[in-house]
């Protein structure tokens, strides 16, 4: 028997309670929906990710050539990263995520894009503060100062 609602993970973080849950929306013929909550606020839902894909397409459309090095701030449910990896020109993708449990969800394939991102050799995750890294030595601890497209 399929559960209509399931809490997949709960973690206490420095920002508060982080919850990953899955539900089947009966009003949409049982469509599977993933949701992320931080405390009492909804951060993201698999129902609404068109904006993430559109922003990725807009950003990458400005690039030319091959061998793009791309960095994304925030992993979430992985829709931005998955959209970037659809471009064959992306040679390397670094995704910086502030909350370690979010990276763990992808590595454990608890979220829809987990397997896709974790198995793509072009994609790496780093746990950290995107904005602090941008102000510091860069996004790749193994290659300080490296520039990205």
Residue ranges of predicted features:
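N-terminal auxiliary segments of SAM/dcSAM-dependent transferases
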Residues: 1-33
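The AdoMet/dcAdoMet-binding core of the Class I SAM-like
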Residues: 49-149
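A short, structured beta-strand/loop element
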Residues: 29-44
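Short, conserved beta-strand segments within well-ordered enzyme catalytic domains
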Residues: 19, 35-37, 71-72
């Amino acid at each position: 028997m399929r559960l209509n609602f399931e809490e997949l993970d709960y973690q206490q973080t420095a920002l508060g309670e982080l919850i990953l849950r899955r539900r089947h929306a009966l009003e949409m013929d049982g469509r599977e929906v993933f949701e992320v909550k931080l405390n009492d606020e909804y951060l993201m839902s698999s129902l609404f990710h068109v904006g993430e894909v559109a922003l990725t397409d807009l950003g990458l459309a400005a690039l030319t050539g091959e061998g793009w090095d791309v960095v994304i701030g925030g992993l979430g449910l992985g829709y931005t990263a998955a959209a970037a990896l659809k471009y064959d020109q992306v040679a390397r993708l670094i995704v910086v995520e502030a909350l370690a449990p979010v990276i763990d969800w992808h590595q454990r394939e608890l979220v829809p894009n987990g397997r896709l991102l974790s198995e793509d050799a072009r994609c790496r995750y780093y746990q950290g503060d995107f904005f602090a890294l941008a102000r510091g030595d860069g996004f790749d601890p193994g290659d300080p100062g490296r520039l990205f497209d």
